[in-house]
Amino acid sequence: MDDATPILLVPGLAGSPRIYAPLVPALWRYGPVSVPNHIRDDHMGAIARRILAEAPPRFALAGHSMGGYIAFEIMRQAPDRVAKLALINTQARPDTLEATARRRSQIARAQAGEYHAVLDDLFAGFVHPSRLEDASLRKLVHEMGDDIGADAFVRQQSAIISRPDSRPTLAAIRCPTLVLTGDEDNTIPNSLSKEMAGGIHGAELRILAQCGHLPQVEQPQATAEALVQWLSNSVVSMPRTA
């Protein structure tokens, strides 16, 4: 990969640039690293259009959780601009009725002044069970929540609820693709990562041990190593591993 190729790292729901901070020292050697602003719109199409308007002509794209939903929308709008794709703890499916109901409840609570209680609930599903008492990770989730604010959280949830089904477009993805997840992601089961990897030609699947929904901070070294290999691999079509 050309060293000058920019790298865009899109955070997830209630996520901010802090989530990628542990990875930047390893990634910046492969190109300028930036974290797009994904908090200004309430629809995936609009979020992707704004990111594309502000992005370089061509870039490597990594999306975490909601950031993966945005990445799929970017692939629909401008596939030729994406040199490489990394899908981190995300899925291609649309929202389920159960998930939508939960999101609407979280929206109502956030608007009623219970935003930090909602962040506590999210934290419980975000981290590996062994990290539930990790005060530093809980603090990070709250700091990122404060970075975006309750109003942006509501916009993000609205965008997630209305996102399209990306499974029909998986086969059209032809750039080198990494699918990365944790072995105990209680927010998005890794079976859905396997589904994505199976639908994308040549995608590589990596499942990190002792990891939940936040691999960038739960397993930063393993995550950085996976992304460095993704960036440095010049093969157009990468093998898929179980």
Language model: regions and residue ranges:
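Conserved alpha/beta-hydrolase catalytic His-Asp/Glu region
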Residues: 95-98, 113-172
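Flexible "cap/lid" loop of the alpha/beta hydrolase fold
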Residues: 44, 76-77, 81-120
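Gly/Ala-rich beta-loop-alpha elbow adjacent to hydrolase catalytic centers
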Residues: 63-67, 71
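Conserved HGGG/HGGXW glycine-rich cap/lid loop of the alpha/beta-hydrolase fold
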Residues: 1-50
